[in-house]
């Protein structure tokens, strides 16, 4: 099994986390929603897998390219 | 209410029945009269900017206040308003230091633990940019609208809600164009044309419009462009440098592409400033020749024209009504909500300036 790190594409704040550690995710499933410059930007699973780590909490600030979650494929 | 819902990127919007909440203490229910269909909507529809789905697009509108929350005193039922995505909290660092358009406070929306403003049964419909104007009603924060005079035509007022403020504001506020300075604007869509009109109002000397569509270059002339360049027929950078004998004081990129951003930089004279208004797709990197910094060239972004919209928009309304701001030519067609997909498709061709949805009253 391979671990896949999921980075944020933008700088912003974590508005809502929609998945939990242990969840089985399909490709493109939404893990969390970031708020950046008035936009609600989803962070999605790039491929199918199991969510093994959430590295941020609601209201945390995140930087572009910061890893926010890890899935195991 | 009927609304145009985006459920998946790169698929048409669906006209659906959607429910809208009652106003919270600081919220206002607005019945839109007109909503512009903007190229920025297309960026989210085609996925070049990701957005939480499903959502109702639309962010450029004018309407009439239908109902206000218990704490709202700024507007009352029946007031004419323009909505703006630059909702401001009024007390964060950015607001307090005068940069209201950069306010990032989430409090102008609803928090995850609150009932959503828009929903369909148990399904949350994400509000687009705290507005979602492709709908028969909008529920927004009181700091996402401005009152306007009632003799302002609503279809023209809608344009002030985004494209006019973005283009004119970039010239007035972000760049601070001085009278007599030379300006080039790359891209003559709604925002670029507004920048050209703004440069004319600001008293710019040479105003060079750059595009690849003849009809848009003609429109640019009617809004104040002193020169036009068809970038499909020549080296636009070379032409600008020749016309200005060395480059512009100010350039504006109003498309959102790497190549045209780099051209905006290359068109500058030493000491000049390039302002990037266009939405460059997420993940795109821009390359600049490092030695150019020795010539004190500057490059900056502009978001919604660095606006203070409660002050700016009523002024832009006055500019229109006293003949300085030319909004009549900007509207190429009035449409119904059900025709929104055709309007978005037309934007892709780059032929039309703007379609405006008119809602039945």
Where are these regions (language model features)?
Chain B
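Residues located in well-ordered beta-strands
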Residues: 2-4, 14-19, 31, 62-64, ...
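Residues in the short beta-alpha loop(s) of Rossmann-like NAD(P)-binding domains
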Residues: 9, 213, 280, 305
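Mid-domain Rossmann-like dinucleotide-binding core that forms the NAD(H)/NADP(H) cofactor-binding site
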Residues: 136, 143-145, 149-234, 238-239
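Glycine-rich cofactor phosphate-binding loops and adjacent beta1-alpha1 units
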Residues: 175-179, 191, 201-202, 212, ...
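Cysteine-cluster motifs in flexible loop/terminal segments that predominantly coordinate metals
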Residues: 85-143
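Rossmann-fold dehydrogenase core element
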Residues: 272-273, 287-329
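Glycine-rich beta-strand-centered segment in the early N-terminal region that forms part
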Residues: 21-35, 46-96, 101, 147-151
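C-terminal hydrophobic helical "lid"/dimerization subdomain
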Residues: 246, 250, 262-266, 310-361
């Amino acid at each position: 099994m391979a671990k896949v790190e999921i980075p944020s594409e933008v700088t912003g704040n974590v508005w809502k986390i929609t998945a939990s550690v242990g969840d089985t995710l399909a490709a493109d499933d939404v893990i969390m929603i970031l708020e950046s410059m008035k936009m609600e930007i989803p962070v999605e699973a790039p491929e199918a897998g199991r969510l093994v780590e959430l590295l941020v909490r609601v209201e945390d600030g995140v930087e572009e390219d910061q890893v926010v979650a890890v899935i195991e494929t | 209410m009927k609304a145009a819902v985006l459920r998946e990127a790169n698929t048409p919007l669906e006209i659906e029945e959607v429910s809208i909440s009652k106003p919270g203490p600081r919220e206002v229910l607005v019945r839109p009269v007109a909503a512009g269909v903007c190229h920025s909507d297309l960026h989210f529809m085609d996925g070049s900017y990701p957005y939480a789905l499903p959502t109702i697009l639309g962010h450029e509108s004018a309407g009439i206040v239908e109902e206000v929350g218990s704490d709202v005193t700024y507007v009352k039922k029946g007031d004419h308003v323009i909505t703006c995505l630059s909702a401001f909290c009024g007390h964060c660092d950015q607001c307090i230091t005068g940069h209201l358009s950069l306010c990032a406070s989430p409090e102008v929306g609803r928090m995850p633990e609150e009932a959503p403003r828009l929903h369909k049964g148990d399904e949350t419909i994400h509000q687009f940019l705290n507005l979602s104007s492709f709908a028969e009603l909008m529920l927004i924060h009181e700091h996402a609208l401005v009152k306007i005079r009632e003799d302002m035509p609503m279809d023209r007022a809608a344009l002030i809600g985004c494209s006019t403020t973005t283009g004119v504001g970039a010239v007035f506020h972000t760049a601070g164009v001085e009278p007599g300075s030379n300006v080039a604007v790359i891209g003559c869509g709604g925002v670029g044309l507004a920048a050209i009109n703004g440069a004319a109002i600001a008293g710019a000397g040479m105003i060079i419009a750059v595009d690849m569509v003849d009809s848009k270059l003609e429109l640019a002339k009617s809004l104040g462009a002193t020169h036009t360049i068809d970038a499909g027929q020549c080296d636009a950078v070379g032409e600008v440098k020749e016309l200005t004998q060395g480059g512009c004081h100010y350039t504006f990129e109003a498309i959102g592409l790497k190549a045209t951003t780099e051209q905006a930089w290359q068109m500058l004279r030493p000491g000049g400033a390039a302002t990037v208004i266009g939405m460059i797709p997420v993940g795109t990197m821009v390359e600049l020749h490092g030695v150019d910094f020795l010539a004190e060239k500057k490059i900056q972004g502009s978001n919604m024209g660095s606006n203070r919209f409660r002050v700016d928009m009523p002024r832009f309304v006055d500019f229109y009504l006293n003949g300085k701001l030319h909004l009549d030519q900007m509207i190429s067609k009035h449409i119904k909500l059900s025709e929104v997909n055709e309007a978005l498709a037309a934007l892709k061709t780059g032929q039309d300036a703007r379609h405006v949805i008119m809602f039945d009253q």
